[in-house]
Regions:
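A charged, aromatic-enriched C-terminal amphipathic alpha-helix characteristic of glycosyltransferases
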Residues: 61-62, 265, 272-328
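Short hydrophobic beta-strand element within catalytic cores of glycosyltransferases
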Residues: 238-242
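Conserved acidic donor-binding segment of nucleotide-sugar-dependent glycosyltransferases
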Residues: 253-264, 270-275
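Nucleotide-activated donor-binding/catalytic signature segment of Leloir-type glycosyltransferases, i.e.
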Residues: 185-207
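A short hydrophobic beta-strand element within the catalytic core of glycosyltransferases
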Residues: 216-218
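Short alpha-helical segment that forms part of, or immediately flanks, the ligand-binding pocket
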Residues: 207, 230-235, 249-250
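Conserved donor-binding/catalytic core segment of Leloir-type glycosyltransferases
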Residues: 124-129, 134-176, 288
Length: 338
């Protein structure tokens, strides 16, 4: 099958530093090629995917329809990772990676990134974003620090809650930043007792920290669509303490972490690592359907359905739409006290 992966934007595939969606698309492309399929990648000019053809728009392109000319005639299906900019003549599938606005509608052939994410948008169709385990280091030997990997400038990611849980557990919290952190936040972080701020790191440095961390603290206060940082931590052998929001109950099991809305309960899990096995954490990814090959196989099933039936939906089934009243960044409950 000839699959065209489409994600035009400022961040290359794979990203040089931060870019979870772009990294995931890279892994998906790797897996499709490994399974014997032909892949074209339409992306930023600095992108690369061994074994795939790269197509991109010229930086001075003024024609708003020029993107259509990038799709090869031999393409069987186009896999968009952003809303198409107009009508598409080829069969296509759209993956939505974020949360929609209340009442926002999506094309019939739309797939989401977790069961809960799909339900929040009136759908049953989802594919977990798989990672390539070979891109991560694993060790049974862990060190005494916790990690925070998230866009900390978003209140919903709850950096303050993570710092409080680590401090109560008597453990240093190491915070990896992202490119869009406000300067005031970068100045504030180093002053927090028990927090070490690393700023924006490349993949090797991030993977090294993941391979040695005791755990990942991920106390989000919103409906998390997926949370790639969670599976990246698990495959590296770090257990996860998090809130039970969005997709997280689908990923974190009692053998691989703790879920709670109370800081003190998460702190207890941080304090007692003997409850969790690094090998069990890694196996959760390898055997739980969270690898890039798992993802590719599930998408191939959806591609085949679209090509044979024309649509993912059943006759008379409404197109996906964000639930009325769903507010993505509304802060969900969190108990920060004792």
């Amino acid at each position: 099958m000839h699959v065209t992966l489409y994600k035009l934007g400022k961040i290359p595939i794979p990203p040089k530093l931060y870019g979870g969606t772009e990294r995931y698309i890279y892994w998906l492309g790797q897996a499709l090629i490994a399974l014997g399929h032909r892949v074209t990648l339409i992306a930023n000019a600095e992108s690369h995917l061994p074994g795939a053809e790269l197509r991109t728009l010229a930086s001075d392109e003024k024609n708003p329809q020029a993107w259509l000319n990038l799709i090869p005639e031999s393409t069987d299906i186009v896999h968009f990772h952003e809303q198409p900019r107009g009508p598409v003549s080829k069969p296509y599938l759209l993956t939505i990676h974020g949360n929609g606005r209340p009442g926002e509608q999506f094309p019939p052939n739309t797939v989401f990134v977790s069961r809960r994410h799909a339900a929040n948008h009136g759908s049953r169709r989802f594919v977990y974003p798989g990672i390539n385990p070979d891109d991560f280091r694993f060790s049974e030997r862990r060190e005494d620090y916790a990690l925070f990997l998230a866009k900390a400038s978003w209140k919903v990611k709850n950096l303050q809650g993570a710092a409080a849980a680590a401090r109560r557990a008597g453990l240093e919290l190491r915070v990896i930043g992202s490119r869009d952190w406000p300067l005031r936040l970068q100045r504030w972080l180093p002053r927090i007792r028990g927090v070490r701020y690393y700023g924006l790191l490349g993949r090797p440095e991030k993977e090294e920290l993941l391979s040695r961390a005791r755990c990942l603290i991920f106390p989000v206060r919103w409906e998390e669509p997926f949370g790639l940082a969670v599976t990246e931590a698990l495959v590296s052998g770090a257990y996860v303490v998090a809130t039970p929001y969005g997709s997280l109950p689908e990923i974190v099991t009692p053998e691989t972490g703790r879920l709670s809305t109370r800081m003190v309960e998460l702190a207890e899990a941080v304090k007692h690592p003997q409850q969790f096995s690094p090998a069990a954490c890694r196996d959760r990814v390898l055997r739980g359907g969270f690898t890039h090959l798992d993802t590719a196989r599930k998408y191939l099933d959806y591609y085949e359905r679209i090509l044979t039936r024309g649509s993912l939906g059943e006759d008379g089934e409404p197109a996906p739409a964000t639930k009325p009243g769903f507010m993505a960044k509304h802060l969900l409950p969190w108990g920060n006290g004792a």
